[in-house]
């Protein structure tokens, strides 16, 4: 056992004296290469009408004007990307065969905007006109929000698959569960 300790000690002493590949940093002498491209993004949050639309149930033309105004501002501030929240609480701010329309858009979950339009398609087209990338921002886990004003739509996951929901539903308007 003592022999092993001596060998390890000898190895450590020898290894400590070997020249290492030294790269001494001298402040101010080496600049890292600039990134090939900067990502300057702004978020447009739609849950609880944080950023857009300013309130639920606005006329479609007003919704469009507000969205275009946000995209104009992002371009003016030299952003090159927008992250647009399109799925807030297992609902959609785009035409979806699987999930209901968002209450933050129309005021009632599951209600189609009138006249019908696709906010995501509009956002993509208008962002590209301004030289902005548009990234669709999905929240994959949240199924409800405490500020919900309307009951879950009939095709909402809370109603179609309540067994997979792990939240307290007593305070959700019209959820039918406690």
Sequence positions of predicted segments:
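Bacterial N-terminal signal peptides
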Residues: 5-17
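A structural motif corresponding to the C-terminal end of an alpha-helix
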Residues: 72-78, 116-134
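Outer-envelope exported proteins of Gram-negative bacteria
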Residues: 81-85, 133-139
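Glycan-recognition patch characteristic of GH18 chitinases/ENGases
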Residues: 65-70, 96-102, 109, 117, ...
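Mature N-terminal, pre-catalytic/accessory segment of carbohydrate-active enzymes
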Residues: 18-84
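Active-site-adjacent "subsite" loops/lids of carbohydrate-active enzymes
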Residues: 45, 49-65, 125, 129, ...
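Aromatic-lined carbohydrate-binding/catalytic grooves of carbohydrate-active enzymes
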Residues: 77-114
């Amino acid at each position: 056992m003592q022999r092993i300790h001596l060998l390890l000690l000898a190895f450590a002493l020898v290894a400590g004296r070997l020249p290492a590949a030294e790269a001494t940093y001298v402040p101010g002498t080496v600049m890292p290469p600039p990134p090939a491209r900067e990502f300057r993004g702004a978020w447009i949050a739609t849950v609880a009408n944080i950023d857009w639309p300013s309130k639920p149930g606005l006329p479609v033309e007003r919704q469009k004007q507000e969205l275009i105004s946000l995209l104009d501002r992002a371009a003016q501030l030299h952003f090159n990307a927008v992250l647009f929240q399109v799925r807030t609480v297992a609902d959609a701010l785009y035409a979806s065969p699987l999930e209901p329309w968002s209450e933050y858009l129309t005021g009632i979950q599951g209600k189609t905007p009138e006249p019908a339009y696709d906010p995501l398609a509009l956002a993509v087209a208008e962002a590209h006109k301004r030289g902005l990338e548009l990234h669709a921002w999905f929240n994959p886990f949240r199924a409800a929000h405490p500020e919900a004003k309307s009951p879950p739509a009939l095709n909402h996951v809370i109603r179609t698959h309540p067994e997979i929901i792990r939240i307290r539903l007593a305070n959700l308007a019209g959820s039918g569960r406690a």
